[in-house]
Amino acid sequence: MQTIKCQVLSLAFLFSTYAVAGDDLPSEAVLLLDESIKGNLHSETKSGKEAADEMRLSAVKVEAYTWGIQEGAYFRNNEIQSLLNKNSFVLNKTVTLSKFLIDGQMLMPTVLEAERVYVQNGASEARSINMSYTLDKSPKIVSQAPTWRDYLVRTMPKPRKPIRNAYPKNSVESAAWKIEFERGWFKGVEQANKIYQSDLNKMHKDVTGLYRFRFLLAQNIVTIPRLGRDKSSVMILDSGKTIYLNDVKYTIQLDSQFNKVTEWKPVFNRGSAHER
């Protein structure tokens, strides 16, 4: 115990001798400072210069690759947006969600469909499901029906060029710059394509889910959500500083749910309610 106590006291003494802000610099630090001011530390050895060149080359590569990614993604996104605008007439006709509005103010819920689901509940129990439906997105109040633009239109800010010192300064750096910029460019194009595909998949999922809900609604398999209106001819707010005339407040009073099987009403149609 006495030995441990001595060790602790020694450590305490050691840490107590550490310099803190406000103390004088030790002689070693003063010497380094003086030599740096006089310029006596600039005589680099060959190995030191090579190390500095390697560090700069690595920085040049990173800068070129990063800039290439940004420029590639920006270029490809502009291409995609241009193609979408050129085909806007067809898209406006193809992707129409106004038919999924209830009372012109509420967007229908979406329904997910899964086939041949197998669920293993431990070693002694399992379940095989031929078909399942799940209410996914709840109904929501909207000012207008969403369009394809809400899903697919994306803007990217124009990338900023690298700072002057980041550009290559010799043939070795120029060669590395070219390779890394091209590699980054195509990586950026790939990223822009993935972003667009993700947006497209999201739109397809939502539109398909809306059609599926309407198909189930036609058979009374699901209930229709209810939109409530609370109308006030005059409403005074902010201690009399604001007045609303003909104010209408919309609220979703009842969400959708699946009906009992006994309430289902099979409908024979030509597929108009279950369009894909």
Task: Give short role names for the model-derived ranges.
Residues 1-9:
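Bacterial N-terminal signal peptides that target proteins for export
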Residues 22-151:
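N-terminal Sec/ER secretory leader and immediately downstream segment
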Residues 104-276:
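Mature extracytoplasmic/lumenal regions of exported proteins
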